[in-house]
Amino acid sequence: MRLLQGSFSMPNAHNRPHVFIVQADLPRLKTDAWLLPCDAGFHVLSSWIPQEYQAGLAQRNTDTYVLPVALFDEWTSGRRRTVRHNDWPGRSMPWLTNVGGGSKYEVAWYLEAVSQFVEEASTWAKAGLKRSRPLLGVPAVGTGFGGQWDKKAGVIDALFDHLVELGRLHDVDIVFTLFDPQSFAAAQLARKRRVEVGSFGWDLDSHLLASATALAERAKAGALVMFLGSGVSVGAGLPTWRDFLGRLADQAGLSDSELEALQNLDAMDAGSIVERYLGGREALEKSTRALLDTQECSLQHALIASIPHEAAVTLNYDTLYESASKVVVGDVAVLPQERNPRAKRWLLKLHGCVERGDLVLTRKDYLRFGERRSALAGIVQALLITKHMLFIGFGMTDPNFLRILDDVRRSLGDVSNEKDLSHPIGTVLMLNHDPLRNLLFDADLKMESMASAHAPDSARQLEIFLDLIAFRSASTTAFFFDSTYDALLSAREREFRDALQNLHQEFAEDRPENIWAEFEKLMAKNIKE
């Protein structure tokens, strides 16, 4: 095993704590615990509080709410700056943390608050541990209304270093969560500099390091599309397809023997049986909505959304991918219902959406799919032929998708005996080794197993793999025209930036029309990226 271009200073170590970086909405991200910024009076900005929770809170003003937490001596004196807030609607546990210091405080003051949070939250999270180690969420404290907004670069740079050390000290994983593309790019640049000097790396086997880097190159070239299976949503607390059927069957009152028989049926036939036991279509859809009722994305959703891509395909009914992507690119066009040519990303939902009442759950649904099924299959076939498809959380057992894959295989020419993987049409990320399944697809798809003797948690290895793709494909120039990130630019880079801005102003009134539009695009790309 080796680390990418740089590693932690500890030789021959494996399965170490990791700091992930995502562009995401932290209150909507599934973690074991997360830092909820507030001030000494427990005042919290409305952007941190889900709308379903705001109704019962007192408002300080139009943008700020007061959380119902009693003041205590250690808090008012400033000795303690973090406290668990149990009364929260989500599954992830927020810790109110006082980071509202204003401009009078230096960066170290914010880092101390983060230290208190990680120390207390890690101890609490380990008591009910479900992952191999706890996952804590931390935002870029101090860079908004916390008082250091004009020095974002220095805060983000110092905070990333601090999170790496805290993760090692308390044996926890941390997801550093940035809301806008500028701060996300700044965090990735901070990490890049640590990689270059050997103080940060990814604990992955060498073949996975190479595969993730190759996929990142495809993403940067606009050649990568995603295929999301139910495994992606498991980290958000949603069931796999097998568990989903099992829970529906429990609600329908099936016996253990009937449930066992149900699991052996084709998915659509199993759905038909459950529908009958539940009492009809309306009851089936109601139960489905209840089982998929969560507003928190998994870490995999956030990592996938942070990787550049324009299109994705899924059999999932939930809307978590859409929520995760909205933070990065705005609203996602969901096909086949929505046609939004302005959308920067679109998602093809082959089996419908829980919010639209068009779920494909039963054999009757599938048969009624009719001509639309053929049209949607054609879109998937085109993506497989023209792009490289990355399969995540998908077991490669769905008969409808396998039919699509077979059509593509035949259209490209059956090379099943040649075993030529120089140009695979896709990559499948698997949690475990499955040699027999590999034989079925190894002429068309690259099969990557996350299983490792050094890292027993394959799901966590998958997250680290996706984090590496996100890092290798991330822009590090999105903040170029934002002066609050000047600390990340060299003197020469700042000089070049200022010259571009002066040039833009100089010719704004008397534009050379034939090239001005392209120049505007260049400026806008780096401002909004």
Task: Tell where the protein language model's regions lie, with residue ranges.
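Phosphate/ribose-phosphate-bearing ligand recognition and processing surfaces
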Residues: 99-202
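Active-site glycine-rich loop that binds ribose-phosphate moieties when present
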Residues: 155-164, 210, 363-379, 404
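Short Gly/Thr/Asp-enriched flexible loops that form oxyanion-binding sites at enzyme active sites
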Residues: 46-50, 146-160, 238-241, 325, ...
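Glycine-/small-residue-enriched capping loops at alpha/beta junctions
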Residues: 2-130
